[in-house]
């Protein structure tokens, strides 16, 4: 127990004997041991662990009884109730040396635990073609039929390797035998595809400078290695090799991107295992299509015809002539862009004034003139051919701009049009100076 300090009692309140010690100093509880000096330094008391937040009402898993004694020692922290020892600080990732971090993709640890788990579940591999196994199967079938009896009618034999079962066949014994190689149909173009790929490898001269995929452990890498091995064997021996797997592998030769351009040190296969092969092969397919089009005799004939005789300009779609573009007659303009292009100047100044007058109409052109005069003074004149149908762009402007031909002094701001029919109409006034035009 702590020795009580000597205090001087006054009428109003208590004060410590030593005036330098504050009266608000933390009072050490009596159930806490006295701090022991370690190496001359006073040991700091561990504070009580206050459970707050989601753990505020949590109950301790320790047995709560009066006989349990709690000690404040580092050896048995698990039994110390209400106090928490700070755990050892976790080593940060930045403290690791750079040599520990692998600079390449490493998937060696993936699937290790799965193999260990499934290894015990899989049945032991057996020789499926052995005669002993057929005898054992016959024995097991007879014993099952004897014991079970009529309950085996609707049941089927459970196969050791279900992925070897040929669905659709009813013979259970033949299901256990694997398919023979002679049953596989060899495509008629197998020799052509083998020779095609072997000639590619001969053109490249060696397989070593071609950088293969970095992820040889994946399915794509396995296919690549198998294809390269069989293709190299085919380059050495010209005899026909019966290998049904190679027939499927050789169809992916374009997909595997073996071509001459890889030796130019310009294009390289992707090193990233998550890189999409379709993106690379699609670019290469476009490149091959361009080469085929360049060598195609049909395209060559078209190109030679264009060089010999250029295509004549049709009346409906004239070809652009740069020489006559600036000297074009403004009264015969074909496109909307040329219609508004008035920046060029003719040779003489008198002609320019005439062109400006003809191009820029006055405000009274659409209101005061009659229909006949408007038809005569067209700004744009097109060659009217009965064979060529008239498009909306080549339609006469004046027909679209004069909705009412009955009144020559028509103006869109003449509000007599909207007056009720019972009221007699006033005589039409002079032409409006505030026309749209």
UniProtKB/Swiss-Prot annotation:
Q: Where is the composition biased (Polar residues)?
A: 63-87, 399-409
**So which domain of life are we looking at?**
Eukaryota
Q: What is this protein called?
A: Uncharacterized protein F12A10.8
Renumbered to this chain, region (Disordered) spans 63-97, 112-147, 346-437
In this chain, composition skew of type Low complexity spans: 425-437
């Amino acid at each position: 127990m702590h020795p009580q300090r000597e205090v001087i009692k006054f009428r109003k309140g208590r004060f410590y004997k030593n005036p330098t010690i504050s009266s608000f100093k933390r009072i050490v509880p009596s159930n806490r041991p006295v701090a022991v000096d370690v190496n001359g330094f006073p040991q700091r008391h561990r504070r009580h662990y206050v459970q707050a937040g989601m753990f505020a009402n949590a109950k301790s898993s320790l047995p709560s009884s009066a006989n349990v004694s709690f000690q404040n020692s580092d050896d048995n922290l698990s039994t110390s109730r209400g106090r928490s020892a700070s755990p050892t600080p976790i080593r940060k990732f930045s403290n690791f040396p750079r040599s520990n971090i692998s600079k390449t993709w490493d998937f060696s640890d993936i699937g290790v635990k799965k193999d260990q788990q499934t290894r015990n579940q899989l049945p032991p591999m057996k020789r499926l073609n052995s005669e002993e196994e057929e005898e054992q199967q016959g024995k097991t079938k007879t014993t099952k039929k004897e014991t079970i009896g009529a309950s085996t009618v609707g049941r089927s034999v459970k196969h050791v390797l279900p992925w070897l079962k040929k669905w659709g066949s009813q013979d259970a014994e033949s299901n256990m035998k694997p398919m023979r190689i002679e049953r596989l149909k060899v495509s008629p173009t197998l020799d052509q595809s083998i020779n095609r790929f072997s000639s590619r490898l001969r053109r490249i001269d060696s397989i070593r400078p071609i950088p293969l995929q970095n992820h040889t452990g994946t399915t794509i890498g396995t296919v690549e290695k198998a294809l390269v091995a069989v293709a190299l064997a085919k380059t050495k021996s010209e005899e026909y090799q019966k290998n049904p797997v190679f027939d499927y592998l050789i169809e992916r030769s374009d997909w595997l991107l073996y071509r001459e351009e890889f030796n130019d040190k310009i294009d390289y296969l992707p090193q990233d295992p998550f890189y999409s092969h379709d993106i690379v092969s699609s670019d290469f397919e476009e490149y091959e299509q361009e080469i085929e089009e360049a060598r195609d005799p049909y395209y060559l004939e078209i190109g030679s015809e264009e060089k010999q005789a250029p295509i004549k300009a049709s009346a409906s779609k004239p070809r652009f002539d740069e020489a006559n573009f600036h000297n074009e007659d403004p009264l015969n303009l074909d496109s909307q862009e040329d219609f508004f292009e008035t920046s060029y100047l003719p040779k003489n100044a008198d002609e320019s004034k005439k062109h400006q007058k003809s191009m820029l109409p006055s405000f009274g052109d659409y209101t005061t003139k009659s229909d006949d005069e408007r038809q005569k003074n067209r700004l744009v004149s097109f060659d009217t051919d009965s064979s060529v149908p008239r498009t909306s762009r080549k339609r006469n402007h004046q027909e679209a701009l004069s909705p009412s031909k009955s009144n020559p002094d028509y103006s869109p701001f003449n509000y007599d049009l909207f007056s009720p029919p019972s009221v007699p109409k006033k005589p039409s006034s002079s032409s409006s100076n505030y026309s749209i035009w």
